[in-house]
Amino acid sequence: MKSFLVDQDGYYGEFGGAYVPEILHKCVEELQNTYLDVIESEDFKKEFDQLLRDYVGRPSPLYPARRLSEKYGCKMYLKREDLNHTGAHKINNTIGQILLARRMGKKRIIAETGAGQHGVATATVCALMNMECIVYMGKTDVERQHINVEKMKMLGATVVPVTSGNMTLKDATNEAIRDWCCHPSDTYYIIGSTVGPHPYPDMVARLQSVISEEIKKQLQEKEGRDYPDYLIACVGGGSNAAGTIYHYIDDERVRIVLAEAGGKGIETGMTAATIQLGKMGIIHGARTFVIQNEDGQIEEPYSISAGLDYPGIGPMHANLADKKRAMVLAVNDDEAIRAAYELTRLEGIIPALESAHALGALEKITFKPEDVVVLTVSGRGDKDIETYLG
């Protein structure tokens, strides 16, 4: 049976690969040749696990959401990534990659960020490990995620506002790649999602796979079986979804539901529903679905959530959708906000806008009472309070 995980050439089916400018060939190749040896080594695992436990506060709870279960007629569990240090799943990946960068002798860490969660997580771990940190962030996002910008500065990072294009995540990523091209030898570029050239999508998925590793153990304890009927997660680039499904990706008993950002509606042109609207293309070094116009130019995506407005999608998820392994639902802005309020009023948990898209998918699915459903709350909603109240 063919696996839905990456093959030895860095592809998921026909998606993925590494399409990078000549100047970065060496960096990317060095990473491809190093990452598995390092992250599978005993001393890396030991240090990574210890930091996840003592610093991040893992394992994160698998919370039986009683009132949400009653509303949707199933057994609903929430995987609480919002309870991690820094408030989201992002830190699982930043700790792993910065440990790798340190072992590769890199001195300077650069990152891109949309909602600011990956930026904060990167700045946090750089402070912990005494590394220089530069974060690229679109000017639009700097304005709408002001509090995260202040946190990064307090942590000692340099935040560079990017003023090209739509001034959001795509543009921040372009700028970070430019920086990497200028400083290939001493700089490590830490990508925050399962996007970019191979090995990034696989590396980020492996570092985030701690999520599904814990779900297996926790379900065994709570349900007497280690798999759910449904796994539900939001996708922008796809890292929290990749972590949620990693250990179940080839298990046909488990249905995978991915919620992407519908924006103002997929027919409005104001959307980030890449899987439903995208055509095959290349973005940031990987072949995947990309929202583009007739001439193949990348379109500006839109979502109320700064963490989901990316015009591409991780190659793992593109392949899952293409092969019909995952069900993909577009959740609009107002559906996400409604779902966030519902979780807050039913369970007393304020989710991030990104996670609210996963919650917004619930009303689009018909569950059976015995269905065990695990939904990942990828982050907490503190950063989005103004949007919710607006």
UniProtKB/Swiss-Prot annotation:
Residues with PTM N6-(pyridoxal phosphate)lysine: K90
Keyword Lipoprotein: no
PROSITE patterns the record matches: TRP_SYNTHASE_BETA (PS00168)
Pfam families assigned to the protein according to its UniProt record, in alphabetical order: PALP
The reaction(s) this protein catalyses: (1S,2R)-1-C-(indol-3-yl)glycerol 3-phosphate + L-serine = D-glyceraldehyde 3-phosphate + L-tryptophan + H2O
Subunit structure: Tetramer of two alpha and two beta chains.
UniProt name for this protein: Tryptophan synthase beta chain
Protein species of origin: Bacteroides fragilis (strain ATCC 25285 / DSM 2151 / CCUG 4856 / JCM 11019 / LMG 10263 / NCTC 9343 / Onslow / VPI 2553 / EN-2)
Name of the gene: trpB
